[in-house]
Amino acid sequence: MFTRTDGSYVFARWGRPICPVVFGVQEETLVIMKSAIEAVCIAAGHRTDELDPELGSNLMMFFFSDWEELRAVPDLDQMIPQLDNVVDRLVAAQANQYRAFRFDDQGAIQACFVFLRVDEALQQLGADSLALSQAVQAMFLWSQEAFKNRSPLVVLDNGTTVMRPEIAALLRAGYDPVMPARANDASHTLRLAARIEVAQ
């Protein structure tokens, strides 16, 4: 879940409360997004807040219909280095989402920028599923392959969408206070597994 495509192991979690802001959605969707983020934080043992003392908002989510729109967002190139090159790659890949992270001096997540091009695939998810999925994916620096073939969510028999139990357990283990906020050694997975086993 945390092994990069180049074979390196990189784990990072938030080192501060998450202060979200969402752009490009209607009020009812905004409420759903923020509720999902709060729910995932509670499940992980982390917390949200209204304002980050340094950044104001530290989890910024942008919804739009075309990657080209990003080039016109004021000062976005200051948050996303080489913005034009990033947009070019996303357009070429026909991607529908992109996440960029910033880290503090300890290597913990300091900020996360989420960009969602709302195509047919994302529209079919529905607001609740999309919100929950994006909240989960913003909690760690997941590998590029983590959810490529399997969603972090599962639909129950009653139609409710929830986190897969193993993902919820991984969040709780990763945010355990005794665990590091940053790890670059694959042995970290053994510590995560041990925390999950103890919790069960």
Regions flagged by a language model, labelled:
Residues 32-46:
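Short, non-transmembrane amphipathic alpha-helical segments
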Residues 1-14:
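Disordered inhibitory propeptide/activation segment of secreted metzincin zinc metalloprotease zymogens
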Residues 44-48, 69-76, 86-87, 192-200:
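PEST-like low-complexity, intrinsically disordered acidic/proline/serine-rich tracts
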Residues 50-70:
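Acidic helix-start/capping segments at beta-turn-to-alpha-helix junctions
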